[in-house]
């Protein structure tokens, strides 16, 4: 799901920043429309229209992540476009595709990877929420949301049925957030100074 959002958002963000003008305006307004919906509501709407399966849940979660990655990529691309080495490359006639692949994309890579690490934790939470509501993974497919939902009926007699997957979910999300912070410290050159 994160790969879908990362790929789609990176393509849209670089396209919007590189071409600018009307294309930039249209793509970013489309991203603003997607951003205007709460993530869980948009996921429920997409799951209701696509049907309940783990693949559809991945697609819905991926669509939710596209605007965030698009905005991040657009901002980094616009920053790179103002650099003198890129202006020099344009002046000597370097093609647009070479500029994107050799100059812009490597500079976008660091922030996008950090965002992806944090997005993994949110994707796990969204999938668990959808499965808890009965819209994500369906039994007997394993999902922490399904396990928490199953244990809900036995919470007074056997709280560990819901507590164990809840703690596993917490540890997974916490771990991905720590990983994202570590990657940011490693890949952000401004913090290394």
Each model region followed by its residue ranges:
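Alpha-helical transmembrane segments of integral membrane proteins
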Residues: 1-193
């Amino acid at each position: 799901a994160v790969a879908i959002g990362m790929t789609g958002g990176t393509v849209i963000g670089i396209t919007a920043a590189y071409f600018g003008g009307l294309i930039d305006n249209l793509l970013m307004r489309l991203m603003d429309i997607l951003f205007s919906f709460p993530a869980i509501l948009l996921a429920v709407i997409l799951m209701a229209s696509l049907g309940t399966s783990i693949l559809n849940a991945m697609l819905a979660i991926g669509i939710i992540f596209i605007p965030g990655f698009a905005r991040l990529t657009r901002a980094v691309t616009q920053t790179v476009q103002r650099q003198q080495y890129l202006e020099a490359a344009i002046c000597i006639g370097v093609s647009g595709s070479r500029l994107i692949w050799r100059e812009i994309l490597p500079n976008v890579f660091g922030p996008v990877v950090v965002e992806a690490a944090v997005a993994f934790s949110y994707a796990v939470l969204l999938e668990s929420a959808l499965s808890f509501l009965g819209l994500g993974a369906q039994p007997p497919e394993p999902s922490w949301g399904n396990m928490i939902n199953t244990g809900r009926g036995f919470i007074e007699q056997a709280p560990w049925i819901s507590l164990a997957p809840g703690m596993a979910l917490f540890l997974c999300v916490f771990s991905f957030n720590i990983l994202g912070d570590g990657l940011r410290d490693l890949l952000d050159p401004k913090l290394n100074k």
